[in-house]
Design a protein with these regions (language model features):
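Nucleotide/phosphate-binding catalytic cleft detector across ATP-hydrolyzing
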Residues: 1-159, 167-287, 294-340
Length: 340
């Protein structure tokens, strides 16, 4: 980056839960997709981790927004402000004036034309000059290290915060895909509802997220790897008195059952639409899991048992899409599947 390099290249995984930015092959920003705005002036107060700390704790003059819902932009203005704020965090100090941005952004494979347009417009408003889009399962496959241009079939299941993307990839294209709006956020919401219904305790989105991370599981039998019970503090729903409730992984596994079944059904439906030759490749290679949802205890085992095809968790599931987007950024001229 010299004083006169006029183009800065950044790759962005614009996620419902987290936004990750890569520049020069390194992750430079990895922050929650949250922005805090002043209600009176609509000016940005905080973005990322700082805004997340304010989430669910604000007074009437501040609103915290998660601009993406179900993997797509729900609040256009907030999304643009958030992208601007996060791009600012990327080191641009050593320029005399702000460079023009070349960007590659990951988008859900089930996006409509309107949704793709919204991402592109947001990026352009946030300073992007040259904006390319890549479908997330394709980016995840590249990030995992799969040769996506090879004439063989690979299946990716990317479980993010807002959507689960399932795609069969061959010869640099998506052969069959299925994108459902059941993902990490729904698991968190299932836990919130369960705690309220079963234990009469009110828990915040963040507390439900902690429960999911500490004792979340896809199976009710974990054997020796079972996590210890997690103690939840919160107000009684009826009396508002403080409560202390221990939660075990078995009950969490039960309450996540419905959402996980939806993901299983979506995977089976994508396999049904896969041509037989590619299906044979997938059985041979196994199916790759990426995204934060891949970290749910024993999810890979449950899916392997249910579908009879081995499931492999990506090496760094949280950053697979971002890494793949970073590789795409270096190969903008070569990868014909990038959308302009």
């Amino acid at each position: 980056m010299g004083l006169f390099s006029f183009t800065q290249e950044i790759a962005m995984d614009l996620g419902t839960a987290n936004t990750i930015i890569i520049t020069n092959g390194k992750i430079v920003v990895d922050e929650p997709s949250v922005v805090a705005l002043d209600r009176r002036t609509e000016k940005m107060i905080a973005v990322g981790e700082k805004a997340k700390l304010m989430h669910e704790k604000t007074h009437e003059n501040i609103r915290t927004i998660r601009p993406l819902r179900d993997g797509v932009i729900a609040d256009f203005y907030a999304c643009e402000q958030m992208m601007r704020g996060l791009i600012k965090q990327v080191n641009t100090r050593n320029h005399l004036f702000s460079p023009s941005l070349r960007m590659v952004i990951g988008v859900p494979s089930g996006s409509t034309e309107v949704e793709l347009r919204a991402v592109r417009d947001s990026a352009e408003h946030a300073g992007g000059r040259d904006v390319y889009l890549i479908f997330e399962p394709m980016a995840a496959a590249i990030g995992i290290g799969i040769d996506v241009e090879a004439p063989e079939g690979n299946m990716i299941v990317d479980i993010g915060g807002g959507s689960t993307e399932i795609a069969v990839i061959s010869l640099g294209g998506i052969v069959s895909n299925n994108s459902i709006r059941t993902a990490g956020d729904d698991l968190t919401e299932d836990i919130r509802e369960y705690m309220s219904r079963q234990h009469n305790v009110k828990v915040s989105e963040r507390m439900a997220e902690r429960i999911k991370i500490n004792v979340g599981a896809a199976l009710t039998e974990l054997g020796d790897d079972a996590p210890e019970d997690y103690i939840v503090h919160g107000p009684n729903r009826i009396t508002a008195l403080p409560m202390e409730v221990p939660v075990c992984y078995q009950e969490v596994a039960h309450c996540l059952e419905k959402s996980i079944s939806k993901i299983e059904t979506a995977i089976l439906s994508a396999l049904e639409n896969t041509p037989p030759e590619l299906y044979a490749d997938i059985v041979h290679n196994g199916i790759y899991l990426s995204g934060g949802g891949a970290l749910l205890r024993e999810l890979d085992k449950r899916l392997t048992d249910k579908i009879n095809i081995p499931f492999h968790i990506a090496e760094d599931p949280l950053h697979a899409v971002a890494k793949g987007t970073g590789v795409a950024l270096k190969n903008v001229d070569r990868f014909s599947f990038l959308m302009r």
